[in-house]
């Protein structure tokens, strides 16, 4: 099942001590993002050539962009070289001004294991990257419940969980290693409680998985959002 808002999110981040201003901005953001994408691609949780939405904010000016657009690398399977290539194109297209924060994200289909076959799911994850003042961060979010023991309606899905939860857990572990940062589960959402290895359902006092779909998705009053 897929919700209209985030089911679970995980984050990573670190300081880039001693990095020059340019390297700690656009280039660093894209390098971390594409490094993370390569990890997810290896687990088939993101598939295809990444198409990135990139925003470069001007320092000290609210809602002012030096660059805002979509781009994708031509270099495959080499995140550092791909990030350098895309960063160079972004810098060439940027307006003049001091770089403030940099944000980028990838929305990508991924493969879910159902029975003996993989099924392609559009928008399985959103992968985000950011850079500001020498700090780089990455976040991974999903609106789906393939990683939970019970679906969003509280129904047991042991086969789906057994097939896909270990894939997510392995990806989170590999992301921590690739990004040189501990996996930090984000705050619980109304659908699930993320942890370092995946996510957990909510349960009522009787020990039954809660039907969070009926509570929050039956009559949604919002559009699709992350």
Model-assigned labels for residue ranges:
Residues 1-155:
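Structured alpha/beta or helical-core interaction and ligand-binding surfaces enriched in interleaved
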Residues 134-226:
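Acidic, proline/glycine-rich low-complexity IDRs
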């Amino acid at each position: 099942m897929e919700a209209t808002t985030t089911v679970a999110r995980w984050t990573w981040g670190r300081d880039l001590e001693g990095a020059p201003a340019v390297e700690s901005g656009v280039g660093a953001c894209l390098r971390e993002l594409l490094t993370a994408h390569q990890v997810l691609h290896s687990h088939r949780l993101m598939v295809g050539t990444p198409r990135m939405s990139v925003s470069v904010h001007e320092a000290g000016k609210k809602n002012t962009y030096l660059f805002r657009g979509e781009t994708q690398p031509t270099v495959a399977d080499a995140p550092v070289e791909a990030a350098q290539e895309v960063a160079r194109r972004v810098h060439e297209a940027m307006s003049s001004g001091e770089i403030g924060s940099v944000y980028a994200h990838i929305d990508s289909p991924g493969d879910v294991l159902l029975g003996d076959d993989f099924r392609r799911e559009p928008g399985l994850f959103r992968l985000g990257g950011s850079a500001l003042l020498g700090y780089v961060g990455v976040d991974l979010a999903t609106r789906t419940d393939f990683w939970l023991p019970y679906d969003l309606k509280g129904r047991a899905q042991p086969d789906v969980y057994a097939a896909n939860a270990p894939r997510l857990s392995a990806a989170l572990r590999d992301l921590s290693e690739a990004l040189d940062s501990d996996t930090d589960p984000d705050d619980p959402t109304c659908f699930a409680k993320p942890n370092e290895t995946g996510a957990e359902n909510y349960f009522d006092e009787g020990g039954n998985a809660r039907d969070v779909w009926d509570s929050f998705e039956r009559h949604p009053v919002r559009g699709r959002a992350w």
